[in-house]
């Protein structure tokens, strides 16, 4: 990528650089991918760019975010037949890898929001695993939920996704609990590997 101050300047640069790349470096320029464009919205190695206070900044491209959401959904699917330990390991590996690659981007706000969705997916897995009313009741009690509420939620007919966002399930499978059993979350890991 070559950054210029104006479109005319970019067009002149392209005219000059193309012969150098093809005749001096013996490289072929891809006509479809070689464009003069405003920096906003351009996708490059999963990143996109924007201008803030006169300076170029990095964001994660929407397509990269969509791909990440799809992958998290796959990893938190119970149809893959993994046990909790293997799934947790796979998820943590993905969180570390994704964050280390995109740590240069401005993603704080997105990560805080996405972690809520991510934790809800994890809670849904556990709720599905508990299956029977008595099993749900036993685990809820074990995790500190009072008897009447535990019985009420254990008997709930609400769908898995909906119940995973309920106050009781959020309280029993809290952030502290999930971290305690080894889960890593995007925003926490981002803070750990970046110095702002």
Predicted regions and their residues:
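Non-catalytic terminal/accessory segments
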Residues: 1-196
């Amino acid at each position: 990528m070559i950054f210029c101050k104006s479109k005319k300047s970019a067009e002149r640069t392209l005219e000059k650089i193309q012969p150098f790349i093809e005749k001096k470096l013996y490289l072929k320029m891809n006509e479809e991918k070689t464009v003069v464009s405003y920096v906003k919205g351009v996708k490059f190695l999963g990143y996109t760019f924007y201008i803030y206070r006169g300076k170029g900044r990095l964001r994660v491209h929407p397509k990269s975010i969509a791909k990440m959401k799809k992958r998290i959904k796959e990893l938190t699917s119970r149809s893959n037949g993994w046990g909790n330990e293997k799934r947790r390991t796979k998820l943590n590996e993905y969180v570390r890898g994704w964050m280390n690659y995109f740590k240069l981007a401005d993603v704080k706000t997105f990560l805080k929001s996405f972690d809520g969705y991510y934790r809800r997916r994890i809670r849904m897995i556990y709720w599905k695993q508990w299956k029977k009313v008595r099993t749900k009741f036993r685990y809820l009690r074990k995790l500190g939920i009072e008897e009447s509420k535990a019985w009420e939620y254990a008997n709930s007919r609400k769908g898995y996704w909906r119940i995973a966002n309920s106050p009781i399930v959020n309280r029993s499978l809290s952030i502290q609990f999930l971290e305690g059993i080894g889960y890593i979350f995007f925003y926490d890991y981002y803070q750990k590997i970046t110095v702002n």
